[in-house]
């Protein structure tokens, strides 16, 4: 159990997708203007990561890995296209669910919801799973931990950006300029976790 808690904490803080690896920056910067929208996108990314990492783990270990289907047959050259296909299918199902049951959130996320399919944080989580050779339970923990970490980062940035609306930001830094500086400072804060050995 300790191993899974350690993996979860590492995925959330030490190896944060947004602030340690800078993955998913497009949606991270664009949707972090309001906390409510950022939280909704964070939940969507967490759900997609939490489902796609274990699903791709099964596909990788049962189909793509060297000798998984037939001895001597290595289908690992299909990793990227297969991983993207599984992620796209999961995002399509999530998009239909949000459209049906949460139309306000669906409209607020707009074009960024289908873009989760090509969000490099999602693909990064799946690629790290394959590269680090996680087993199925580890991939579940890592997927949800990575999603929670990304959500924590985007909600924190959205909260800071909401407060900065009332700040006297210099004209040259208004908009994305101060957002990049804020993201960098947040990343420095999260870097302090890198010394933690779990």
Curated annotation (Swiss-Prot):
Mode of membrane association: Multi-pass membrane protein
Enzyme Commission numbers on file: 7.2.1.1
GO molecular function ontology, one term from the record: oxidoreductase activity, acting on NAD(P)H, quinone or similar compound as acceptor
Keywords: Cell inner membrane, Cell membrane, Ion transport, Membrane, NAD, Sodium, Sodium transport, Translocase, Transmembrane, Transmembrane helix, Transport, Ubiquinone
Location of the protein in the cell: Cell inner membrane
Major localization listed first in the record, in broad terms: membrane
Keyword Lyase: no
Membrane-spanning parts: 11-31, 35-55, 77-97, 109-129, 140-160, 176-196
Gene Ontology CC: one annotated term: Gram-negative-bacterium-type cell wall
Source organism, top-level taxon: Bacteria
InterPro entries on file: NqrDE/RnfAE, NqrDE/RnfAE_oxidrdctase, NqrE
One GO term (biological process): respiratory electron transport chain
Pfam family, one: Rnf-Nqr
Catalytic reaction(s) noted: a ubiquinone + n Na(+)(in) + NADH + H(+) = a ubiquinol + n Na(+)(out) + NAD(+)
HAMAP family in the cross-refs: NqrE (MF_00429)
Subunit comment: Composed of six subunits; NqrA, NqrB, NqrC, NqrD, NqrE and NqrF.
PANTHER family with a match to the protein in the record: INTEGRAL MEMBRANE PROTEIN OF SOXR-REDUCING COMPLEX (PTHR30335), NA(+)-TRANSLOCATING NADH-QUINONE REDUCTASE SUBUNIT E (PTHR30335:SF1)
Function: NQR complex catalyzes the reduction of ubiquinone-1 to ubiquinol by two successive reactions, coupled with the transport of Na(+) ions from the cytoplasm to the periplasm. NqrA to NqrE are probably involved in the second step, the conversion of ubisemiquinone to ubiquinol.
Annotated family: Belongs to the NqrDE/RnfAE family.
Stated name of the protein: Na(+)-translocating NADH-quinone reductase subunit E
Lineage of the organism: Bacteria, Pseudomonadati, Pseudomonadota, Gammaproteobacteria, Enterobacterales
């Amino acid at each position: 159990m300790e191993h899974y808690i350690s993996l979860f904490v590492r995925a959330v803080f030490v190896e944060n997708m947004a602030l340690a690896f800078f993955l998913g920056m497009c949606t991270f910067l664009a949707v972090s203007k309001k906390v409510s929208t950022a939280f909704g996108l964070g939940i969507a990314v967490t759900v997609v990561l939490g489902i796609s990492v274990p699903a791709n783990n099964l596909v990788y270990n049962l189909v793509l890995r060297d000798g998984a289907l037939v001895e001597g047959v290595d289908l690992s050259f299909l990793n990227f296209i297969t991983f993207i296909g599984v992620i796209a299918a999961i995002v399509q199902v999530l998009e239909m669910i949000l459209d049906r049951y949460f139309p306000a959130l669906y409209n607020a996320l707009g074009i960024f919801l289908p873009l989760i399919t090509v969000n490099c944080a999602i693909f990064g989580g799946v690629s790290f799973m394959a590269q680090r050779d996680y087993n199925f339970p580890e991939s579940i923990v890592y997927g949800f931990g990575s999603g929670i970490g990304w959500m924590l980062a985007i909600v924190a940035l959205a909260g800071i950006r909401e407060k900065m609306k009332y700040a006297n930001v210099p004209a040259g830094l208004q908009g994305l300029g101060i957002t990049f500086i804020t993201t960098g400072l947040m990343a420095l804060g999260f870097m302090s976790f890198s010394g933690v050995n779990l």
